Amino acid sequence: LDHSRVEAFLKTGAAGTAEEQKKMCEQMHLTDYNYLLLIPAQERQAETHVGEELRLMMIAEQVRQSYGRTQFVYNTTEGSVLVVLTLDKGTEAEQVQMCRQTEALHGLLEMTEPLILSGRFTRLEQLSSVYWQARNMAAYSDRTQKVCYLSGESLVRVTTTDITSLERLNEYLLSGRAQEAQSLIGE
């Protein structure tokens, strides 16, 4: 994908013509089950002095190894890395596995800050909004966590071992019922 087109899309949410949108969806491998993973900017990591290109190649390879297939990996202009994770069927087992793989990726990348993982989005048009929510919420992330889960406009503090029913948790979070989500996390 053309870097300037992707950057313009992330900033404005405008993906261009229907043909351009279709091409972008194909190149990002979008399915009905997409999740955004935001990896913090390089300058915010301790002791990392790797060029942007090399860093992006290394992250892309770690992502491929962690999730077992190629995912869309993109280096934003502010230095964070955006990864579009896709699932085949969006089953609870797939989602829990994705969360575990994301926590493992945190260790492989030797991150000092948490990764931000969004809830599900289904359309290309939603990507820009999800990206900005993740980017804005990164400043408020819990530094003691490997992964912070973004739900709507708030971060949810959970680890994959706390999730007994990811589908039910997603339902609570999407409907704004944070109290029920917290009680589910406590189970």
Which residue stretches match the model-derived regions?
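Interdomain helical linkers/hinges and coiled-coil/dimerization scaffolds
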Residues: 1-95, 120-180, 185-186
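Catalytic core regions of nucleotide second-messenger enzymes
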Residues: 73-78, 105-115
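Soluble C-terminal extramembrane regulatory/interaction domains of multi-pass membrane proteins
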Residues: 94-95, 99-107, 179
